Amino acid sequence: MSTADFVFIESKDPIFLDLQAFCTALREKFPGILIIERTNPEKAYSLSWDYQIPQLTLESSLSSKKNVFVIDYFDSTNRLQDYASYIIWLRKWFPPEEKVSFCDEGYEYVFELPSDLSQKELENYLRTRFDE
């Protein structure tokens, strides 16, 4: 992937996302991950993480308002399946009843991510968007 993708919640209410629980889950899912937390409220992103192993490389961040996950880079051996799994995993951090979407940097491709979306459904969407 050469451009960023986003998983975002469409809510006007403040978002509660337990950063400690999220960081713990990141460390469990991706052992050895590098997590950088920023405490400056003027920064656009409060958290960023990088992970690199031979089978998977990813770079992501969380907006300071905790309403947008940014996927700056993602590549893996099983890219389509792994990317769909990662997007669904990020979606689970937002309340299931809220409208959450996935889009590209240019907001050209927007795909709703209902909480009960299957990985196979997301893979089918991604297949239409990315060349394998």
What is each model feature region?
Residues 1-3, 34-39, 63-69:
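Generic detector of short, locally flexible boundary/turn motifs and exposed helical patches
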Residues 1-31:
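Short, extreme N-terminal segment that most often corresponds to the first beta-strand
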Residues 50-132:
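Charged interaction segments
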Residues 9, 15, 33-36, 53, ...:
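Weak global preference for isoleucine
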Residues 24-34, 91-98:
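A common structural junction motif
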